[in-house]
Regions:
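Conserved GNAT acetyl-CoA-binding A-motif
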Residues: 141-156
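A short, internal acetyl-CoA/4′-phosphopantetheine-binding micro-motif in the GNAT/acyltransferase core
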Residues: 120-127
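Local sequence-structure signature of Cys/Sec-based thiol-disulfide redox active-site neighborhoods
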Residues: 1-27
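Structural micro-motif
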Residues: 48-58
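Non-catalytic, surface beta->alpha helical segment in thiol-disulfide oxidoreductase systems
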Residues: 59-82
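A conserved beta-strand-loop-helix scaffold within acyl/acetyltransferase catalytic domains
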Residues: 91-95, 99-115
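Conserved acetyl-CoA-binding loop-helix of GNAT-fold acetyltransferases
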Residues: 128-141
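Thiol-based oxidoreductase modules, predominantly thioredoxin-like and allied folds used
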Residues: 28-41, 51
Length: 175
C-alpha cells in the first residue's frame, strides 16, 4: 500500500488533474477507482461518508478532500513526502516552509520601498537544532539579489545575518 491514495474516477477531470499533479511531483500513489472497484468505493465511503465524495486523498492515513494545489503541497510536505521548497506568500507577507508539525515562516512588512523582516517562527520542538538558522539562510539567499532595501528587526534574523559579510552589507548591519 502506498502512502498516497487517490480516490476518484478516471473520467473525472479533477481526478485526472490530481493524477497529473502527483506525477509532475514524481510521487508514487495508488489510484482507487471508485466507479470500477466496489472495495475502493466502500473505503471512500468509510473515509469521507460517501463514495461520491471524490476526488479525495488519503495521505499517510489523513483524509484530504479536493484540495487546491498549495494545500496539497502543504499536506504532502507535512507528511514528509514532498518538498515544495521555499514559498513566498506576498499577500500574507511571509516566506514559508511547510513542515511537520507546523510551518516555519519569516514575516515582513513594507515601509515604503523597504522590506522589514520582523519575525521568524519555527516549531518549538526544533529549537536548538539549527533549523531556524538554516531557514533564515534560505530566506536570505532568496532575497539577497533584490534591489529594494531590506531591514531586519528580528534579533534572531540579525544574528544569522551577521554570519556573512554580504548579508551585513545588504541588510545594513553594523552601520
Amino acid at each position: 500500500m502506498h502512502d498516497i491514495m487517490l480516490f476518484g474516477e478516471v473520467r473525472c477531470h479533477k481526478t485526472r488533474f490530481y493524477q497529473a499533479a502527483l506525477e509532475e511531483r514524481g510521487l508514487a500513489y495508488e489510484m482507487a477507482e471508485v466507479d470500477k472497484d466496489k472495495e475502493a468505493a466502500a473505503r471512500l465511503a468509510e473515509l469521507a461518508g460517501s463514495a461520491d465524495k471524490f476526488p479525495t486523498f488519503q495521505i499517510k492515513g489523513r483524509k484530504v478532500r479536493n484540495p487546491k494545489l498549495p494545500e496539497l503541497d502543504k499536506e504532502l510536505a507535512r507528511a514528509g513526502l514532498y518538498d515544495p521548497g521555499l514559498i513566498h506568500d506576498e499577500r500574507a507577507q511571509r516566506f514559508i516552509r511547510h513542515m511537520a508539525p507546523s510551518d516555519a515562516f519569516v514575516s515582513y512588512v513594507w515601509q515604503g520601498d523597504r522590506m522589514v523582516m520582523t519575525h521568524i517562527e519555527v516549531d518549538p520542538s526544533f529549537r536548538g537544532s539549527g533549523l531556524g538558522a538554516r531557514f533564515a539562510t534560505e530566506v536570505f539567499e532568496e532575497v539577497e539579489s533584490r534591489a529594494h532595501e531590506i531591514r531586519l528587526t528580528c534579533p534572531f534574523l540579525r544574528k544569522v545575518a551577521l554570519t556573512r559579510p554580504e548579508w551585513r552589507k545588504k541588510f545594513k548591519l553594523g552601520e
